[in-house]
Swiss-Prot record:
Residues given in the record as Mg(2+) 1 binding sites: 7, 139
Record bears the keyword DNA-binding: yes
GO molecular function ontology, one term from the record: DNA binding
SUPFAM superfamilies, per database record: Ribonuclease H-like
Official protein name in the record: Crossover junction endodeoxyribonuclease RuvC
Subunit structure: Homodimer which binds Holliday junction (HJ) DNA. The HJ becomes 2-fold symmetrical on binding to RuvC with unstacked arms; it has a different conformation from HJ DNA in complex with RuvA. In the full resolvosome a probable DNA-RuvA(4)-RuvB(12)-RuvC(2) complex forms which resolves the HJ.
Binding site for Mg(2+) 2: 67
Annotated cofactor note: Binds 2 Mg(2+) ion per subunit.
Amino acid sequence: MRIIGIDPGLGRVGYGIIEIQNEKKKFLDCGVIETDKNKKEEDRLYEIFNDLNTLINQWKPDIAAVEKFFFYKSSTTISVVQARGVIMMVLASKNIQVSEYAPSQVKLTIAGSGKASKKEVIEAVMFNLNLNYAPKPDDSADALAIALTKLNEAGIN
C-alpha cells in the first residue's frame, strides 16, 4: 500500500510518499510543487493540477492524507482554499480515498503534543521513517507527518 501526504498551499504544496511492506514503513519520496508567484492565480492552480497529476501517475498511491484548512483572517485564505480544492479534485479524479487531519491532530499523533514545534515534528518524522536527514523544505516534512498520521490511525506504527 502507498500513501501520499499533502500539505496544501498556493505557492508551495508539500508532498510525501510512504509505502507499507509487511507492516513496515518505507520512505519513497518527498518534495514540493512550487508555483511562480509572478503568474496569475489561475495559472498557478493549473500548475498544481498538472504537477500533482504527474506525481500521482508516477507513484500510484492507494490512499491520501491531506491537511485540513481552518479559516484565518489572512489575504491568502482564499488562495489556499482554491489550491486545496484543486488537490481534492485531482485525488477524486484518480479514485483515491482521502483522509483529512487538522494540524494539531498531526502534531499530537506524530510528536505527542498538539502544540509541538516544527523542529519536534521534523525529528518525529525522521525517527518514524528512520531517516538520517531532515526532509526539506519543511512543507515536505509536514506532508510526511500528515501521511504518518493516517498510517497511525490505520494501526501501522
